[in-house]
From Swiss-Prot:
Signal peptide positions (record): 1-20
Sequence similarity: To P.denitrificans and M.extorquens MoxJ.
The protein, known as: Uncharacterized protein in cycB 3'region
SUPFAM superfamilies registered for this protein in UniProt: Periplasmic binding protein-like II
Key words, A-Z: Signal
Domain of life: Bacteria
Species: Paracoccus denitrificans
Length: 83
């Protein structure tokens, strides 16, 4: 019984910080989107990608503007040097 209670307390302590951070991620004033500025046809900084259009549709339904954070995929996958 004591072991089960200890495990329950530890599990609760582990989950509480994660739940507290969720509130920081949600925004009621904008629809936040992270996208590659040059991943045509998916996303593009000029807003012509289909993911840009999907984000715009979601934002319209929520009644808030879209706020982009541009993150080029090349930062995640650096090109190999030419040989």
């Amino acid at each position: 019984m004591r072991r089960a209670l200890t495990l329950a307390v530890l599990a609760t302590c582990a989950v509480l910080p994660a739940l507290a951070q969720v509130a920081d991620l949600r925004s009621k004033t904008e629809f936040r989107v992270c996208a590659d500025p040059a991943a045509v046809p998916m996303s593009s900084q000029d807003g012509k990608g289909f993911e840009n259009r999907i984000a715009q549709l979601f934002a319209e339904k929520l009644g808030v503007p879209v706020a982009y954070t541009w993150f080029p995929q090349s930062r995640l996958h650096p090109q190999e040097p030419a040989r």
